[in-house]
């Protein structure tokens, strides 16, 4: 009788440990899945951060080029101003001012918009026009924001600026 009791006890202990070990294995697999998801999320965050850092570095380089270009233009204008002041000194004829070197100044003084951001400006202008057109067709702010992957506030700002500009133009007439 004791042998049967011990045999039944051993079987229950075996079943208990078998179930216990299976639960541990399942919880470990859940933990592994959770850890892999967290690792993937961290990798995605790192990639987004790297992308943002690269964008910021490109903007910094762009601004440095613009600053360099502006400094060169300031230096050219200073030289031109100095040349103008020197031409007003007696002995220098005003007609000779700029005759030889004016071509250099004119070629260096290009008063156009910096070429670095032209495409970005055109692209943002097209997006702005598309947003205004979609809003005028009755699309909601949320749908427009989702379509262009913009914040809701940005879309509302673009529309409100457009409305303000239209009302100002109408008030003038």
UniProtKB/Swiss-Prot annotation:
Q: Could you tell me the superkingdom of the organism this chain comes from?
A: Bacteria
What InterPro entries does the record tag this protein with?
DUF6115
Pfam families recorded: DUF6115
Intracellular or extracellular location(s) = Membrane
Its primary localisation, in coarse terms, equals membrane
The record's family statement is: To T.pallidum TP0711.
How is this protein positioned relative to the membrane? Single-pass membrane protein
What do the Gene Ontology cellular component annotations say? membrane
The upper taxonomy is: Bacteria, Pseudomonadati, Spirochaetota, Spirochaetia, Spirochaetales
Keywords, A to Z?
Membrane, Transmembrane, Transmembrane helix
For this UniProt entry, which segments traverse the membrane?
1-21
Q: What is this protein called?
A: Uncharacterized protein BB_0265
**Transmembrane helix as UniProt keyword:** yes
The answer to whether the entry has keyword Transmembrane is: yes
């Amino acid at each position: 009788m004791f042998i049967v009791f011990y045999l039944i006890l051993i079987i229950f202990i075996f079943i208990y440990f078998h179930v216990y070990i299976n639960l541990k294995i399942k919880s470990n697999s859940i933990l592994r899945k959770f850890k892999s998801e967290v690792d993937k999320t961290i990798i995605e965050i790192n990639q987004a951060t790297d992308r943002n850092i690269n964008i910021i570095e490109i903007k910094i380089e762009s601004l440095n080029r613009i600053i360099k270009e502006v400094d060169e233009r300031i230096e050219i204008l200073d030289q031109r101003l100095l040349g103008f002041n020197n031409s007003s000194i007696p002995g220098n004829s005003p007609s000779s001012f700029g005759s030889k070197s004016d071509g250099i100044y004119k070629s260096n003084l290009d008063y156009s918009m910096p070429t670095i951001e032209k495409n970005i400006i055109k692209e943002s202008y097209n997006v702005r026009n598309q947003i205004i057109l979609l809003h005028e067709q009755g699309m909601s702010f949320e749908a427009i924001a989702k379509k262009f992957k913009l914040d809701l506030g940005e879309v509302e700002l673009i529309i409100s600026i457009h409305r303000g500009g239209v009302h100002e133009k109408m008030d003038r007439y």
